[in-house]
Regions:
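Residue-level signal for inorganic ion chemistry
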Residues: 9, 59, 84, 149, ...
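ATP-dependent NMP and nucleoside kinases share a basic, alpha-helical "lid"
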Residues: 69-77, 82-117
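Short, acidic/turn-prone active-site loops that include or flank metal/cofactor-
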Residues: 10-13, 34, 108-111, 130, ...
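Hydrophobic/aromatic beta-strand patches that form the interior of the parallel beta-sheet core
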Residues: 6, 103, 147-149
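ATP-dependent small-molecule kinase phosphotransfer cores
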Residues: 10-79
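Small-molecule kinase domains that catalyze NTP-dependent phosphoryl transfer to phosphate-bearing small molecules
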Residues: 79, 97-98, 119-168
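An amphipathic alpha-helix signature
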Residues: 1, 23, 27, 109-117, ...
Length: 172
């Protein structure tokens, strides 16, 4: 299909690693221990923020404006009919109004946990559930999404993705 996809989590990790402004703000919020040997200590940061809503909100307030700015710059450099921004917490940070359309990709909780564990073995079930606890339920997200893709079976998922793609091309 050739649609460029901006992975917000990966870009955020990169920005938190390279942006002097973000590094300084994160150290101010979480202390110098947030970086170990010049690299973001994701384990430390996760332990600090995922059980402290106030710290999580403060970290989001630091990181997400930088990600938004980076996304806009990236999107403007693309030449496709449309772009996709993959982001897990659109509704939680109140950025849903930035998008023309929201595509929610969902799966059963157990499937999500299994996939996250396969993608990054350093995760624990408890850590994943702590992050999920800070996210809205899929049922709440469905109410505000334009498209819903059930991602349980790869063949059915491909059909749904192609349907959404065709519909978006017709709306542009």
């Amino acid at each position: 299909m050739g649609v460029p996809v901006y992975n917000s989590d990966e870009r955020a990790k990169g920005l938190m690693q390279k942006s002097p402004e973000l590094i300084a703000a994160i150290k101010e919020l979480l202390g110098d221990a947030a970086y170990k040997e010049g690299k973001l200590d994701r384990g430390y940061v996760s332990k600090q923020v995922f059980n402290n809503k106030e710290l999580l909100n403060a970290l989001n307030a630091i990181v997400h404006p930088a990600v938004r700015k980076d996304f806009i710059s990236w999107a403007e450099s693309q030449s496709s009919d449309y772009v996709i921004q993959e982001a897990a917490i659109i509704f939680e940070i109140g950025s849903q109004d930035f998008y023309d359309f929201i595509i929610l990709v969902t799966a059963p909780k157990e499937t999500k946990i299994d996939r996250i564990m396969q993608r990054d073995a350093s995760n624990t079930v408890e850590g994943i559930e702590a992050r999920m606890k800070n996210q809205l339920s899929d049922n709440k997200k469905i109410e505000s999404s334009h498209y819903i893709i059930q991602n349980e079976n790869i063949e059915q998922t491909k059909v749904q993705v192609l349907d959404v793609h065709r519909d978006l091309l017709n709306k542009i």
